[in-house]
Amino acid sequence: MKSKILSVAISLFFITSCNTVKKENSKIIEGEIVHTVYFWLNSPDNLVEVALFEKEIKKLMNTNNLAVKMHLGKPASTTKRGVVDNSYNYCMIFTFPSLKHQRIYQDHPSHLIFIDKAKHLWKKVQVYDSTTEPI
C-alpha cells in the first residue's frame, strides 16, 4: 500500500513539475490570431491629446474580454536600421483564441466606442493580423 501511495505521489510530482516547466519555458505567443495595430498621432507633442489617447486605449484594453494576451507600447530605442520603422507613436497588440473572437471584437461596443472617442487624435492607423503557424 505504501509503495502504491509513494508511486502515485512521485508520478503526480513529476507530471506537475513537467507541466510547470513547459509553461514557464514556452516562447510561443498565446492565441491563434495576433492583431497588431500601429498608431500615428496627429499631435504627439500635445500632452493633453496624448493623455486622452492613452486614457481611451487603456479603457479599450481593460474592457476587452475577448483577447488572450495584450500589449501596449511605444517605439523602442533600438539601433536604427533601414528595416526598422519607429515612426509610429503607439503599438497595441491583442491575441485572440480564434478568428471568430477577432471578428466579434471588430463589432464589440468597447472597440467601436474607442474608435469614436479617439479617431480624431490619430492621422494614421495600420493593422497587421496574422495567424499562428506551428513551430
Kindly label every feature range from the protein language model.
Residues 3-5, 103, 112:
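Hydrophobic alpha-helical segments, especially transmembrane helices
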Residues 1-28:
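Bacterial Sec-dependent N-terminal signal peptides
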